[in-house]
Amino acid sequence: MPDATLPACFLGLLALTSACYFQNCPKGGKRAMSDLELRQCLPCGPGGKGRCFGPSICCGDELGCFVGTAEALRCQEENYLPSPCQSGQKPCGSGGRCAAAGICCNDESCVTEPECREGASFLRRARASDRSNATLLDGPSGALLLRLVQLAGAPEPAEPAQPGVY
């Protein structure tokens, strides 16, 4: 009888603990993730004007990207939320999304990406919901200003982003 108690206890313990081992498992298990709709990632950065792209990456059109800084600390909260999220306008690079003008980020790093530098249409789409900004330029004057800013910009390095503000 005592010889059967140990295996029975082991099987009982195994049955109780064979659930999902990840900290933020969705309801219904890991395979139910594909059924969930993606939500927008948490706001971050100064004034909440950015969006989280990873546990230590916060990017916004007006801000650029913060990688591994205090502005990106809020992004660690995404690890504890049960549903997946997605930030950025369009896909770029290898599994990344356009985070700011000319910057492509995935959940681990950011790189400069020419395909994320669409010009005025990118900025206008990203800010279309921001009606509180009375200085938003549209039309020919906005296009001219954007072109001047692009011409004044220095060539960007093709190396991966290092921790800091970009």
UniProtKB/Swiss-Prot annotation:
Swiss-Prot/TrEMBL site (Important for agonist activity on V1aR/AVPR1A) positions: G28
GO CC terms in record: extracellular space; secretory granule
Record GO terms (molecular function): neurohypophyseal hormone activity; neuropeptide hormone activity; V1A vasopressin receptor binding
InterPro entries noted in UniProt: Neurhyp_horm, Neurhyp_horm_dom_sf, Neurohypophysial_hormone_CS
Localization per record: Secreted
Signal peptide region: 1-19
Coiled-coil region(s): none
One annotated GO biological process: vasoconstriction
Cystine bridges: C20-C25, C41-C85, C44-C58, C52-C75, C59-C65, C92-C104, C98-C116, C105-C110
Alphabetized UniProt keyword annotations: Amidation, Cleavage on pair of basic residues, Disulfide bond, Glycoprotein, Hormone, Secreted, Signal, Vasoactive, Vasoconstrictor
Modifications made to the protein after synthesis: A shorter neurophysin molecule (32-123) is called neurophysin-I and is derived from the complete protein (called neurophysin III) by proteolytic degradation (in vivo or after extraction).
Residues glycosylated per entry: N133
Glycine amide modifications at: G28
Family from the record: Belongs to the vasopressin/oxytocin family.
Self-association state and partner proteins as the record states: Interacts with vasopressin receptors V1bR/AVPR1B (Ki=85 pM), V1aR/AVPR1A (Ki=0.6 nM) and V2R/AVPR2 (Ki=4.9 nM). Interacts with oxytocin receptor (OXTR) (Ki=110 nM).
Cited function: Neurophysin 2 specifically binds vasopressin.
Name recorded for this polypeptide: Vasopressin-neurophysin 2-copeptin
Gene that encodes the chain: AVP
